[in-house]
Amino acid sequence: ELAERETLYATRFDGNYAYLVTFLQVDPLFIVDLRDNSNPTLLSELIVPGWSEYLEVMDDQLFAVGVENSQVTASLFDISDKSNPFLSQRFYMGDENEYSWSEANYDEKAIGKVASEGLFFIPYQTWAEGNQLNKLQILKHENGRLEKGGQIDHRIVARRSFTDATGHYLFSISGEELVVSNILDTNNAFEVRRLPLAWTTERTHIFGVNSLQIENAPTNNW
C-alpha cells in the first residue's frame, strides 16, 4: 500500500517501471520498480501541489496534465534518476489565478498529440471579465523542454484534435464546429477555416423554398 486514504488518479506503466499519482491534499508521484513483479519496490515519492490525471513517459521525462488550485496544468518531471525525480516545469491553462477546467482531466482522448513532433493539444475552458472562453492550448516538447505555443479559439469547448499527414494543419472538433488551423509555426497558429457541424435552433420560418433558422447563443454544453 503506497498512500493510505488517498485516491489513485493516474498510472502509467513503462517497461520495468510504474508511475503513479495519488491525491489527498498534495500530489505524490510514486515510481515503482517492477523488475521483480512478485515484489514491486517503491523507488521514490515526490510531493508536489495539486494532482495529475494524465501521464506520458518521454525517455527520461514524464509529461503530465492535471490540476492545481482550480487551474488546469501541464507539467514536466525529470525522471532520469528514478530514486530522485523532480518537477522541472509547470504551465497553467488560462490567466493567472483564473479558474480553468478540461475534459482531459477525466478522458485522455481529449488530449491531442503528435509524438514524433513532441506536440500536445490541451482543450480547456476559463473565464475572463465574466466571459466564458474555450481554448485549445498548443504545447511543444523540444530539446528536453516544454514550450507553451499558441491557442485556438472555439465557440464551445473543443473535445478532440488531430493533425493532417504533413503536421502543418490542426483539426479541432467541438460539439458544434470543426476548426482548421495552420500550426506550421506553433507560436503563431492561426485559423484557416471554421465549419459548422451542428447547431441549436430556437425557431424556423419558411419562406417558399427557403428557411430562416434562429439559433441560441453558444453555451458550455457539448
Where are the model-predicted features located?
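Feature marking well-ordered beta-strand scaffolds used for ligand recognition
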Residues: 1-222
